[in-house]
């Protein structure tokens, strides 16, 4: 029960970090990583508490996807800092018409 509270608080902190910290792109990426880590820990503990050893491949897939997400996010941050010379989210105008 205590682990569930820790996992939910990690997820909540990551979500609040994304909603409240919209100034820098790196802080948004870190909050996304916190969301993924809390999701991974939650799924891993659920699998072990229910004695489901077959879902370890799902855990590895989730870790692989989070590593890909981190590398793509960091490459976007490098491209952003090279073109706009900062990592401010306000300097992004790619989605505006």
Swiss-Prot record:
Record field: transmembrane: 1-21, 23-43, 60-80
Highest taxon in the source lineage: Eukaryota
Keywords associated with the record: Electron transport, Membrane, Mitochondrion, NAD, Respiratory chain, Translocase, Transmembrane, Transmembrane helix, Transport, Ubiquinone
Principal place of residence: mitochondrion
Intracellular or extracellular location(s): Mitochondrion membrane
Membrane-topology annotation of the record: Multi-pass membrane protein
A GO CC term assigned to this protein in UniProt: NADH dehydrogenase complex
InterPro entries documented for this protein: NADH_UbQ_OxRdtase_chain4L/K, NUOK/Mnh_C1-like
GO molecular function, one term: NADH dehydrogenase (ubiquinone) activity
Reactions this protein catalyses: a ubiquinone + NADH + 5 H(+)(in) = a ubiquinol + NAD(+) + 4 H(+)(out)
A Pfam match: Oxidored_q2
SS bond list: none
GO terms for biological process, alphabetical: ATP synthesis coupled electron transport
UniProt keyword annotation of Translocase present: yes
EC annotation from Swiss-Prot or TrEMBL: 7.1.1.2
The protein's role, per its UniProt record: Core subunit of the mitochondrial membrane respiratory chain NADH dehydrogenase (Complex I) that is believed to belong to the minimal assembly required for catalysis. Complex I functions in the transfer of electrons from NADH to the respiratory chain. The immediate electron acceptor for the enzyme is believed to be ubiquinone.
Family affiliation: Belongs to the complex I subunit 4L family.
This protein's name: NADH-ubiquinone oxidoreductase chain 4L
Organism, scientific name: Paracentrotus lividus
Lineage: Eukaryota, Metazoa, Echinodermata, Eleutherozoa, Echinozoa
Gene name for this UniProt entry: ND4L
């Amino acid at each position: 029960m205590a682990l569930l509270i820790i996992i939910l608080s990690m997820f909540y902190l990551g979500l609040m970090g994304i909603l409240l910290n919209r100034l820098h792109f790196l802080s948004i990426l870190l909050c996304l990583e916190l969301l993924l880590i809390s999701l991974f820990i939650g799924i891993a503990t659920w699998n072990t508490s229910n004695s489901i050893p077959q879902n370890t491949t799902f855990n590895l897939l989730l870790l692989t996807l989070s590593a890909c997400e981190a590398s793509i996010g960091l490459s976007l941050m490098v491209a952003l800092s090279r073109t706009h010379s900062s990592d401010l989210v306000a300097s992004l105008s790619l989605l505006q018409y």
